[in-house]
Amino acid sequence: LVDVEENEAGKHLVSHPEVDRVILTGAWETAKLFRSWRHDLPVLAETSGKNSIIVTENADYDLAAADIIKAAFGNAGQKCSAASLIILVGQAYRSERLRNQILDAASSIRVGSPSDLRSQMGPLAEPAKGKLLDGLTKLDPGQVWALKPVRIDKEGRYWSPGVRGGIKPGDP
């Protein structure tokens, strides 16, 4: 097991002819980069993606809201299986009750140090930057904040939960 940066040393190691395969847990862009360095190299990758929860009109809205909050904000949303996209179908989309349950639960999450037993959501692994910072602070055209995330600390590791609406297919 070797932890490799995306620099010249990483490129040299990944593209070396004696490397039989690469197993990667990381970003899709990193997997593509590794393949660009050596096209014949098998890259077995678990990459980031859009994990979705679909809620239909037949769903138990109480259970759906609880599952959405846990899946989206557990581990500060940093788990590879975190739900980053919620799809509400039919009446579920129009349900003010479901919307309020989700927003009330998200806005009531207590953010703080993991050593504080009252905390329900801890810090980001590192200060928000790049795509993550953009996701916490910027909206794409047509999107709105249903619940705008707020930076809580100076360093940028603690953020309140955020919920955006108006997501369209193809949005990042």
Protein language model annotation of sequence segments:
Residues 1-20:
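A structured beta-alpha segment of the ubiquitous adenosine-cofactor-binding alpha/beta core
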Residues 1-5, 153, 171-172:
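Short intrinsically disordered, low-complexity coil segments enriched in acidic
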Residues 15-21, 27-169:
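ALDH superfamily catalytic-core signature
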